[in-house]
């Protein structure tokens, strides 16, 4: 399992409380609004909006909230003016970290993100300081217990997958962003249960700091993820299996 998937697994385990769910809905609503603004309000014709709506439904966001967010994006309902900002920096152990944000006030958000980095032993970098280490990819996690490997490989590779890697407890399927919707639909049509799926920044190569530095990296990523304006966080830090087991309570 890649560093991205391990971080997604940690985040998923900590997102169950009502308070966190409410914050997640707020972030997803902004993401939906941005997607509708940039590509139109029809999910069938706007892959980015379709992904945003799918994520909102997976988080049990009410349909009327989803519709309102779409209408804000298309201008049918008055709403805040948002922009997307990509923050790049370094965490403990020299790992690269990227945080994607949607904000209605960059002048407020930027210094807040800078403080989060500094309080956790990292530092916010300049534009393009670490982005070159990442590529935008579609990432799908499939439980190894829920699918036959040969079947998964066949369907995935026939529908745009670039790589299928096996790791306990999940398979990780990687594809180009433009193939994500087709690949996800093919897996669903084959009744292969998808643990998680997203289009996100994936590191080209990973680094493995010592355990203490990795713990600090996770705390930094959690702090970034807790920020109201941050929609996703990526790193090139590979989390050791022993630390994953510790964080999972195993």
Regions found by a protein language model. Give the residues of each.
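N-terminal cationic and glycine-rich segments that engage phosphates or anionic surfaces
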Residues: 1-125, 129-139, 202, 248
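Positively charged, low-complexity, intrinsically disordered RNA-binding extensions
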Residues: 139-250
């Amino acid at each position: 399992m890649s560093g991205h998937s391990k971080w997604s697994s940690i985040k998923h385990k900590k997102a169950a409380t009502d308070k966190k769910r409410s914050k997640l809905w707020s972030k997803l609503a902004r993401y939906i609004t941005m997607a509708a603004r940039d590509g139109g309000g029809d999910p069938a014709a706007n892959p980015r909006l379709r992904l945003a709506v799918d994520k909102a439904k997976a988080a049990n966001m009410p349909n009327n909230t989803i519709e309102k967010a779409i209408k804000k994006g298309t201008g049918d309902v008055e709403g805040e003016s948002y922009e997307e900002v990509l923050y790049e920096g370094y965490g403990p152990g020299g790992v690269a970290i990227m945080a994607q944000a949607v904000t209605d006030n960059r002048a407020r958000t930027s210094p807040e993100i800078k403080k989060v980095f500094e309080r956790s032993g990292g530092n916010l970098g300049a534009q393009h300081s670490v982005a070159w280490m990442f590529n935008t990819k579609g990432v799908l996690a499939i439980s190894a217990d829920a699918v036959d490997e040969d079947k998964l490989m066949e369907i995935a590779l026939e529908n745009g997958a670039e790589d299928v890697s096996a790791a306990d407890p999940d398979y990780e399927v990687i594809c180009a962003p433009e193939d994500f919707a087709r690949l996800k639909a093919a897996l669903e049509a084959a009744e292969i249960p998808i643990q998680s799926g997203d289009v996100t920044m994936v590191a080209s190569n990973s680094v493995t700091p010592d355990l203490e530095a990795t713990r600090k990296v996770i705390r930094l990523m959690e702090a970034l993820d807790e920020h109201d304006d941050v929609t996703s966080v990526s790193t090139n830090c590979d989390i050791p299996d022993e630390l994953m087991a510790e964080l999972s309570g195993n």
